[in-house]
Each structure stands twice: as structure tokens, then as C-alpha cells.
């Protein structure tokens, strides 16, 4: 049996011994070593101590100590891609799809709960666990899938930030200039953690507050009908909806649940000092992290709601000609030319959305919108960079210096964006948003299936392994994501013409299905289908009920 990397090689003897005897001996279960590779200097170097107290029950002091990772995670729910999806959904469907936003956020919370549990119980993030359990080829493929997801997300975030700079400068800063500014300030802000982890988390909290205030201001100014908003949130139906509304609903799910965010969150929870040998401390950490995540995602839901409701109230089924005429007679008349004079329904994006707000409610609304987009883009770009670092460290076990690793992970995402920004105008650039949201949805199984696999693996998770209800819920989410992806493919195929497109797409589709099937196979083994286990994959089939030596977890 061939090893796959130093850490994997260290696991093979125990596994081989167990296979030779044909037993599921707990002492031979391959588990990750406590410190597989020493980390270079990163966000995770500082551990936040948790106050000790004998007072039983919930403690707000402890909740405050655990507060931070959940709000950083929630920024992925507020990036420019989400904002654009929100405003398009409001303009196309009004308030009819607010319930989709609510339940997509709930589904995202369920995924983040698994990421929390994996990081807290094992002391390792999802990428590190993948490195130790998957053979070389599957784990390299998983790393590539996550890098593609991060690059796609980063393109949305950097483009959104560049558009914000363009709006704030009245077009004086070109898109490529905005991208260059984003590169510089992101690298600067990323080194804020040298002054303390809590200061960095406070800075992210400040950016979220800016988003809440700016988008909340737009909500108060437009004054949507509150009864209709509540009906849209709590009544799960869409009267009179067709294909266009369905595409928007599917796009919401793709925009809300980001694959790399699951990897990110499993890393962020490692920043709290938890004694993993004590089951009660692990249980308490899981509870407080989940509470914080619920609060953070509630805030993100409100901010997304503000955007969707504003455009659902003011711009639902607006015509280009009406918007053009309104802009001509406004204080931002220089933007009127971007809306053609015809009777077609206006198609909005981040750029046009800000312009429309300026045309209807004054220049202040435009600039406040741009500030909100700037905060969304800046914060999500920073967390995307951290996700890239953690994914690369975990999957490849790199020992690079801090600056080299930050520069490399930034370049992977920034260079494609800079190239696109230099040769496209605003309307073409923002039109990429739908495609990039589809990309996130397509790549989501490569995060959901591994985290479901390992949180169901009792040798790794002990008493914190997924129960039957958790397994069923996450299996339903995985099925929903796969169904969405099938819908996208079926909807996209008729737009292609000629074998030059169909043949490469067909090959990619076959490879995609094969890899998802592989992940489903290993996930099934972890869930107890031992008859599927062969060779090294017996590591996914052990039913361990006793302590497993070597795992720094609760016993």
C-alpha cells in the first residue's frame, strides 16, 4: 500500500496491521497526529483564552470570548456577489423570494455547524483532515476545486470593490485602477493581526457595521411595505413566477453557501484555547460557537434582506425608459446614458443599482450605497485571502514565510481579475456575477461531502459524531445542491452550439460526476457501509467505541 505524503505514511502501519488481522481494533485506527506540520506565522498563532468559571448556565462573558470567528465567516454571506444576487432578485421577483433567502441562510448555518464541530473536536481544520485521510490524487483535486472556488469568489469581491471606487470617484478611477488599489489595501489590512487577533476581529466587526448602516439607510429611505416583506419571508410560495424567478431563487442558494467558507470556519474556531481532553469544554465551545454563528448569520440575513427589499419595493418591473427619464432630471444625470430608451424591464447589477438609487433618491443614496459595497468587497476579500492561506496550508502542508504565502494566494485570485478588468467595461464585468455564483454552487459538493464524511467518522469525532438526524439533514442538503447543479446544466446546454463546446463540456461533466461519486462512496463508508471499503479506504469504516490513542480530542 503506497503512502501519500509524510503524514499519510505515518498512518499506514496501523492501518495495515488492522487489515491484516481483519479486525476493527481501535488501537490501530489511523488518526491524525496532533501536530502534523508546524505552521508558519498566521492568524492562528494567537490563542484567545476562555474565562474559567464555576457558575452553571449560559455566560455572556464566555460568549464574548468566543465571538469573532462566526462574524468573519458571515462576511462570505455579505460579499458583492450576494449583494448583486439580492438586488437582481428584488428587481425581478419583488418580495416573493425572501423566504428563499431565509432558508438558504438556515442551510448555510447547518453547514457551518459541521465546520465548527470538526475544528473544535479535532483541533484541525477540514483541509488538514482531508490531507490525512484522502490519498494523494483526490486531495490534490479537492485542493484545486477549492482554489477555483476562492478565485471565483475573489473575482466577485475585487470587482465589487473596484466598482465602489468607480462610483465614489464619479468614474475617475477606472476598474483596473480599483483592482490595484484593492490589492494594496488588502495586503495592508491583512497584517493588522500582528497587532492582536481581537483587534483584527474588531476591524471586521466595524466593516459589518458599515454595511448594516449603509444598506439599512437605503431600507429606511425607500420604506418597503412591511406587511409584504413579512409575507415574503414567512410564506414559502411564489405566485405567478416563471423560469426567470426560478433562476434567481437558485442563484440565491449559490451566492449564500460558499464552499471555501466551510474550510475557513473550521480553521477560525482553532483560535480559542480549548482543552480538548475535557469533553465538557469541547461541548461548551461547540455551543458558544454555534450561538455566535446564529447571531452573525441573523445579522447577515437582515443586511441581505435590506438590499432585496429596497429593490423589490422601488424597482420591481421598472422599465429602462422610466429609469432613463428619471436619471436625466436628477443630480446624477451623467449616468443616464447607461439605461437604453426602451420598454424592456431594467436589468440591474451592483453598478447600475447604485446609479438607480442616485437617480431616484439623490446623490447621497448613490454614495452611501458605494460605501456599503466598498465595505462588503474589502471585508470579503480579506477573509477570502485567509481562506486561501488555510486551504493551501492544510492540503499542501506548506512551510512558506508569511509574506510569501500571502503574496502567492493574493496573486492566484487577483491576476485573473486584473486581466478581465483591463479589457472589459463595467456592464460586462458585473455580468460575470451570475456565472460565478453558478460556479460556487457547482463546487459546493466538494466542501459539503468531506465535512459530512469526517463529522460522521466516529474514530475522529468520538461522541460528537453526527447523529441520525444530522446525517439525514446534511444528506438532504447535498441532494438539493446536486439537484440545483443538474438544473443549471440542463438550462445551460441549449445555449451552446456546435461540438466545439459540447465535447469539452461533456468530458468535464463526466469527470465531475465521477469525482462526486467518489466522495459519496467514501462518505457512505464513514456512515457505516463497511462492505464498500477496500484497501486503504478501510480507514473510513472503523466503528470505534473506545478511546483512540493519538487524537487530541475529548475522551
From Swiss-Prot:
Glycosylation sites: 329, 343
The keyword Ion transport belongs to this UniProt entry's keyword annotation: yes
InterPro entries: NRAMP_fam
Main location: membrane
Residue intervals annotated with topology Extracellular: 82-90, 169-172, 223-245, 313-354, 424-434, 494-501
Keywords of the record: Endosome, Glycoprotein, Ion transport, Iron, Iron transport, Lysosome, Membrane, Transmembrane, Transmembrane helix, Transport
Induction info: In response to lymphokine or bacterial products.
Subcellular location: Late endosome membrane; Lysosome membrane
Role played: Macrophage-specific antiporter that fluxes metal ions in either direction against a proton gradient. Localized to late endosomal lysosomal membranes, delivers bivalent cations from the cytosol into these acidic compartments where they may directly affect antimicrobial activity. Involved in iron metabolism and host natural resistance to infection with intracellular parasites.
HAMAP family in alphabetical order: NRAMP
Family: Belongs to the NRAMP family.
Name of the protein this chain belongs to: Natural resistance-associated macrophage protein 1
Organism: Gallus gallus
Gene: SLC11A1
Amino acid at each position: 500500500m503506497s503512502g501519500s505524503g509524510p503524514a499519510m505514511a505515518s498512518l499506514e502501519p496501523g492501518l495495515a496491521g488492522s487489515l491484516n488481522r481483519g479486525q476493527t481494533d481501535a488501537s490501530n485506527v489511523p488518526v491524525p497526529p496532533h501536530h502534523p506540520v508546524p505552521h508558519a506565522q498566521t492568524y492562528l498563532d494567537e490563542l484567545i483564552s476562555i474565562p474559567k468559571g464555576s457558575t452553571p448556565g449560559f455566560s455572556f462573558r464566555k460568549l464574548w470570548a468566543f465571538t469573532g470567528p462566526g462574524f468573519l465567516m458571515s462576511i462570505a454571506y455579505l460579499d458583492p456577489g450576494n449583494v448583486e444576487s439580492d438586488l437582481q432578485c428584488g428587481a425581478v421577483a419583488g418580495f416573493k423570494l425572501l423566504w428563499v433567502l431565509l432558508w438558504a441562510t438556515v442551510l448555510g448555518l447547518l453547514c457551518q455547524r459541521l465546520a465548527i464541530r470538526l475544528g473544535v473536536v479535532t483541533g484541525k481544520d477540514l483541509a488538514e483532515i482531508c490531507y490525512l485521510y484522502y490519498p494523494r490524487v483526490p486531495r490534490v483535486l479537492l485542493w484545486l476545486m477549492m482554489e477555483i472556488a476562492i478565485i471565483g469568489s475573489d473575482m466577485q469581491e475585487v470587482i465589487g470593490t473596484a466598482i465602489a471606487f468607480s462610483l465614489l470617484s464619479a468614474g475617475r478611477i477606472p476598474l483596473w485602477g480599483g483592482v490595484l488599489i484593492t490589492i494594496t489595501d488588502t495586503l495592508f489590512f491583512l497584517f493588522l493581526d500582528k497587532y492582536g487577533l481581537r483587534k483584527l476581529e474588531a476591524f471586521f466587526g466595524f466593516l459589518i457595521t458599515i454595511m448594516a448602516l449603509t444598506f439599512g439607510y437605503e431600507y429606511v429611505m425607500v420604506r418597503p411595505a412591511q406587511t409584504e416583506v413579512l409575507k415574503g419571508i414567512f410564506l414559502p410560495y411564489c405566485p405567478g413566477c416563471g423560469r426567470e424567478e426560478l433562476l434567481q431563487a437558485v442563484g440565491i442558494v449559490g451566492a449564500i453557501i460558499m464552499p471555501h467558507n466551510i474550510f475557513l470556519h473550521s480553521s477560525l474556531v482553532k483560535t480559542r484555547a480549548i482543552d480538548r481532553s475535557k469533553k465538557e469544554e469541547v461541548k461548551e465551545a461547540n455551543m458558544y460557537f454555534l450561538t455566535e454563528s446564529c447571531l452573525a448569520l441573523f445579522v447577515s440575513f437582515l443586511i441581505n434582506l435590506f438590499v432585496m427589499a429596497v429593490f423589490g419595493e422601488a424597482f420591481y418591473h421598472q422599465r429602462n425608459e422610466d429609469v432613463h427619464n428619471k436619471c436625466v432630471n436628477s443630480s446624477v444625470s451623467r449616468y443616464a446614458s447607461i439605461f437604453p430608451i426602451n420598454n424592456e424591464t431594467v436589468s440591474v447589477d451592483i453598478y447600475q443599482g447604485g446609479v438607480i438609487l442616485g437617480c431616484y433618491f439623490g446623490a447621497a443614496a448613490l454614495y452611501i450605497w458605494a460605501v456599503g459595497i466598498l465595505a462588503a468587497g474589502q471585508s470579503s476579500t480579506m477573509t477570502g485571502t485567509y481562506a486561501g492561506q488555510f486551504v493551501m496550508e492544510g492540503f499542501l502542508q506548506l512551510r512558506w514565510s508569511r509574506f510569501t504565502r500571502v503574496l502567492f494566494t493574493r496573486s492566484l485570485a487577483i491576476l485573473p481579475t486584473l486581466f478581465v478588468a483591463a479589457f472589459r467595461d463595467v456592464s460586462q464585468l458585473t455580468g460575470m456575477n451570475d456565472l460565478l455564483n453558478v460556479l460556487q454552487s457547482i463546487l459546493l459538493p466538494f466542501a459539503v461531502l468531506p465535512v459530512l464524511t469526517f463529522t460522521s467518522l466516529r474514530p475522529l469525532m468520538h461522541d460528537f459524531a453526527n447523529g441520525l438526524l444530522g446525517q439525514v439533514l446534511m444528506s438532504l442538503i447535498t441532494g438539493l445542491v446536486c439537484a440545483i447543479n443538474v438544473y443549471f446544466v440542463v438550462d445551460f446546454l441549449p445555449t451552446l452550439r456546435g461540438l466545439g463546446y459540447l465535447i469539452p463540456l461533456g468530458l468535464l461533466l463526466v469527470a465531475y460526476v465521477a469525482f462526486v461519486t467518489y466522495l459519496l462512496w467514501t462518505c457512505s463508508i464513514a456512515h457505516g457501509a463497511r462492505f464498500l471499503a477496500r484497501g486503504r479506504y478501510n480507514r473510513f469504516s472503523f466503528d470505534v467505541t473506545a478511546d483512540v490513542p493519538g487524537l487530541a480530542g475529548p475522551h
